[in-house]
Amino acid sequence: MGFKGYILSIVFNGKDFANKYYLMLKEFLKQHNLRDKIALKVVLANDEPASNLYVSIKSRVAKEIGLNVEVIKFSANSVQSDILEVIDRENKNLSTDGIIVQLPLLKGMDLNSILNSIVYSKDVDGLSFVNLGKMILGDKKGFIPCTALAVLKILRDEGIKTLGKTVVVVGRSPLVGRPISILLSSKPYDATVIVCHSKSIYLDVYLRQADIVISAVGKPRLIDKSMLCGKPYVIDIGISEIETDNGKILSGDTDFDNIKECVKFITPVKGGIGPVTVLMLMFNTIKAHLINNRMFDVLNRLEKLLEV
């Protein structure tokens, strides 16, 4: 769905968006005799219900399109060396194409040490220092973090122009906000990017300048309609639980019901950015297999298919 002219309040359907591409990937793997030949290993080192749900979704999607997936789960009394040992084993395993670590980790574990223990050619979440460096330098053999890649995919497919536009990114984490701001300020996106964070005093002033708002801070209902001007496009990556009279509900960084009529485009909390992030994980995993097996002609076809 592109924007040809002026369209009011498009609520993005990430589930339908991703499902369309899942069918394409499934057929692509079949055509190139790659079904059941690509393996993703998922390291799960926490017992949070949300993490278990996310892992089950990733596993289900991977299996549906034709990837092999194994979840390696660690108990609550596991130590960091246990995880590093498994990652080292899978780094050396020639049949493993991609390795991801489902966050958060158990308390006391060092995030950077674990993420950087994954060899960059299998780091399909794109969170190691090597891949973040490749992203900054524009090395296409590296892996862009999946959420950032999902944002780029949504902008491209929905016809949301970034050239010369003002993009306000709320959040500067190295996992989400920072990669997005770097990518959008680079070629070919060429946006003017303003990065806001917890210490930004005049958030509303910056937001009113935005053609595009991308928020990833995990603060429920941080952004309301009083902070926006000129009907921007809004991509809400944040997700939090809030208490209501009817129990806990999920909330994004935006007050969705409050602002949805004041924007041109918005992603909801449920069925918004999430399914597209999983789609990009599938893309990165297939890409890893193709690069590691020097199947560059097939990789070119994959990139054209998904337009990434």
UniProtKB/Swiss-Prot annotation:
It holds the Pfam family THF_DHG_CYH_C. One of its GO terms (biological process) is purine nucleotide biosynthetic process. It catalyses: (6R)-5,10-methylene-5,6,7,8-tetrahydrofolate + NADP(+) = (6R)-5,10-methenyltetrahydrofolate + NADPH; (6R)-5,10-methenyltetrahydrofolate + H2O = (6R)-10-formyltetrahydrofolate + H(+). GO terms for molecular function: methenyltetrahydrofolate cyclohydrolase activity; methylenetetrahydrofolate dehydrogenase (NADP+) activity. Pathway: One-carbon metabolism; tetrahydrofolate interconversion. NADP(+) binds at G171, R172, S173, S198, I239. Its EC number is 1.5.1.5, 3.5.4.9. Keywords: Amino-acid biosynthesis, Histidine biosynthesis, Hydrolase, Methionine biosynthesis, Multifunctional enzyme, NADP, One-carbon metabolism, Oxidoreductase, Purine biosynthesis. GO terms for cellular component: cytosol. Homodimer. Belongs to the tetrahydrofolate dehydrogenase/cyclohydrolase family. HAMAP family: THF_DHG_CYH. Catalyzes the oxidation of 5,10-methylenetetrahydrofolate to 5,10-methenyltetrahydrofolate and then the hydrolysis of 5,10-methenyltetrahydrofolate to 10-formyltetrahydrofolate. This is Bifunctional protein FolD. It comes from Borreliella burgdorferi (strain ATCC 35210 / DSM 4680 / CIP 102532 / B31) (Borrelia burgdorferi). The gene is folD.
